[in-house]
Amino acid sequence: MSGLSVFILIALVLSVIIDVLNNSKVEAACKENCRQYCQAKGARNGKCINSNCKCYY
């Protein structure tokens, strides 16, 4: 039973690490056209600042 719980714990940790890395890759890059992306969300304007799309409402 101990071996099974260690395996489940390792699988859980790996899935969390993979999820965090995938999310950071998506958020680290600006959208191709940040202004249009923000306007589609209802903002007045948008700019790429420090590799993040910043929307101004």
Curated annotation (Swiss-Prot):
PROSITE patterns, alphabetized: SCORP_SHORT_TOXIN
Domain of life: Eukaryota
Keyword ATP-binding part of the UniProt annotation: no
GO molecular function: potassium channel regulator activity; toxin activity
Site (Aromatic residue of the functional dyad): Y56
Main localisation: secreted
Site (Basic residue of the functional dyad): residue numbering on this chain: K47
One GO CC annotation: extracellular region
Keywords: Disulfide bond, Ion channel impairing toxin, Neurotoxin, Potassium channel impairing toxin, Secreted, Signal, Toxin
Residues cleaved off as propeptide: 16-24
SS bond list: C30-C48, C34-C53, C38-C55
Tissue specificity remark: Expressed by the venom gland.
InterPro entries linked: Scorpion_toxin-like_sf (IPR036574)
Compartmental location: Secreted
Signal peptide positions on this chain: 1-15
Domain remark text: Has the structural arrangement of an alpha-helix connected to antiparallel beta-sheets by disulfide bonds (CS-alpha/beta).
Family: Belongs to the short scorpion toxin superfamily. Potassium channel inhibitor family. Alpha-KTx 26 subfamily.
Protein name: Potassium channel toxin alpha-KTx 26.3
The species this protein was found in: Mesobuthus gibbosus
Taxon lineage: Eukaryota, Metazoa, Ecdysozoa, Arthropoda, Chelicerata
